[in-house]
Design a protein with these regions (language model features):
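Catalytic-center loop of serine/cysteine hydrolases
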Residues: 1-100
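Structural signature of tandem alpha-helical TPR/SEL1-like repeats
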Residues: 93-99, 128-149, 170-182, 203-217, ...
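Amphipathic alpha-helical segments of tetratricopeptide repeats
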Residues: 106, 185, 220, 254, ...
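Short coil turns that delineate tetratricopeptide repeat
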Residues: 109, 155, 188, 223, ...
Length: 476
């Protein structure tokens, strides 16, 4: 454990080493130095800890610990300032971070870490402008160049390897994994690299348990790492655990009260739990958080709209739709069209809902990651299947449900929260029952309950599937 305090040109570093098995203090030290001595203190602290542990560091380990990548205190200071702003997850602060990194590069053009900082910051920035194709192509080209430069200047810098992995993960590129693993080999305490491997398992492979393992490892290393905390909640919710997700998200909001995606996932958790009024009230209190980018404003009105539809407040939806129409690219994104068609379903106009979702699925829709388009198609298939069930057209419902993607991949938190994939077999069960095929209905309910085996017992679909399965088994 330790802390760093700076006053003017003086810095105080305190450190202590504790045996976690018995809480026994093994070592403690205080270092008061001029800021110009900061790199020497870094070496001194590392060596002191190694001596207490009676570890003999290899030459490579000494080099890695001692490496500052720059002899310039000013460049180092600018990098640290930029890094602080880059993890605030707001577009204005990310631009500030990029400015600090560029200033550091002007002072020391061979300093690898600011290049990595720019690449990581611009990758994050690409999510905030997700609907501007020209901007995305330009910024991701810049990301790749800066990530390559960082690795060329600092091949043994964990942050450089991580940044390339972060960029490739953004592209859903399988090679991301090797860069992220290399980052962890170079720095086993790199929390964000652990988080990004969790992202890799969740986004590209749909392995929820493996993803959770890595998110939790990341949070042990850094409990305040915003993306790891968020993605742990998101994955928990994808497992159907709304109650657990709500506990986690309240802790996350205490740590990150000004990060909009925590508010977005709380709204999703309340909606899954059937607390539609609470979801609406909560989003109304968060409006000021969603004003810094177009993507955030779309998220805000989209959340309000979903809540209003589930509360049957159809007369208030027109106002939400009008607000969405004032946001650039509204006609090329999913929010306006999804809400329009969802409203048709809940108003009982099932044929129009089918036609609307079909047209929506066959149109151009801007999404911020390539593998999200199939997620959106599945959601359209889901609502078309629900509509066909209401119309008693069971074979058409089955046909829609058979078109789902084969596994639960894709991070859909900036799209529509994807709880639909496991529910496809629940709807199949309803359709087969409607057709009188009780054996297929039973198999479908069993598959649904297996897919969502960790889900809350009080979710409506879980309770209904169990009851229907019980009756089918009794009848057979």
């Amino acid at each position: 454990e330790g802390s760093v305090r700076r006053v003017g040109n003086r810095v105080r570093i305190t450190g202590q080493l504790i045996n976690t098995a018995n809480d026994h203090h093994l070592w403690a030290e205080k270092f008061d130095r001029d800021i110009e001595d900061i790199f020497a203190v870094q070496d001194e602290v590392a060596t002191a800890i190694a001596n207490v542990l009676r570890i003999k560091l290899s030459d490579e380990e000494v080099m890695l610990i001692s490496s500052s990548q720059t002899e310039s205190i000013e460049a180092y200071d600018l990098y640290i300032k930029g890094r602080s702003f880059s993890y605030s997850y707001s577009a204005p602060n990310i631009y500030k971070a990029i400015n600090y990194f560029n200033e550091a590069i002007k002072i020391d053009p061979n300093y690898a870490l600011p290049y990595a900082g720019i690449a990581r910051s611009k990758t994050t920035l690409s999510f905030t402008q997700a609907h501007d194709d020209t901007f995305i192509k330009k910024i991701l080209t810049e990301v790749e160049l800066h990530a390559e430069k960082a690795i060329a200047l600092g091949p043994k810098e964990a942050e450089a390897q991580f940044t390339m992995g972060y960029y490739l993960n953004r592209q859903s590129d399988e090679s991301a994994y090797e860069y992220l693993k290399k980052a962890i080999e170079l720095n086993p305490s790199h929390a964000h690299a652990h988080d990004e491997i969790g992202d890799y398992y969740l986004d590209s492979h749909g392995n929820l348990d493996e993803a959770l393992y890595w998110f939790e490892k990341a949070l042990k290393l850094d409990p305040d790492l915003a993306p790891a905390g968020f993605l742990r909640i998101y994955t928990t919710l994808k497992k159907g655990q709304a109650n657990n997700a709500l506990v986690l998200v309240d802790d996350g909001l205490k740590r990150h009260p000004n990060v909009p995606f925590y508010s977005t996932i709380k709204h999703a958790a309340l909606m899954m739990a059937g607390k539609y009024h609470d979801a609406y009230k909560f989003m109304k209190t968060q409006e000021s958080l969603y004003q810094t980018s177009r993507v955030e404003m779309l998220d805000f009105y989209f959340g309000l709209g979903q809540s209003l539809i589930m509360l049957n407040k159809f007369d208030e939806i027109d106002n939400i739709l009008e607000k969405l129409k004032k946001i650039k690219y509204y006609d090329q994104t999913h929010e306006y069209r999804y809400l329009t068609n969802l409203r048709l379903y809940y108003e009982g106009d099932y044929r129009s809902a089918i036609n609307g979702f079909n047209a929506f699925d066959n149109s151009v829709v801007l999404v911020f990651m390539n593998n999200l388009r199939p997620v959106l198609s599945d959601i359209c298939h889901y609502w078309k299947a629900k509509s066909y069930l209401e119309l008693g057209e069971f074979e058409n419902a089955i046909d829609e449900l058979n078109q789902f993607r084969p596994n639960f991949i894709g991070l859909s938190y900036n799209l529509v929260f994807d709880e639909f994939w496991p529910k496809r077999n629940y709807l199949k069960g309803l359709a087969y029952e409607g057709m009188g095929d009780n054996r297929s209905a039973q198999e479908s309910y069993e598959k649904f309950l297996k897919d969502w085996s960790d889900a809350d017992d009080d979710l409506l679909e879980i309770m209904d599937a169990k009851e229907r399965l019980r009756k089918l088994k009794q009848a057979s």
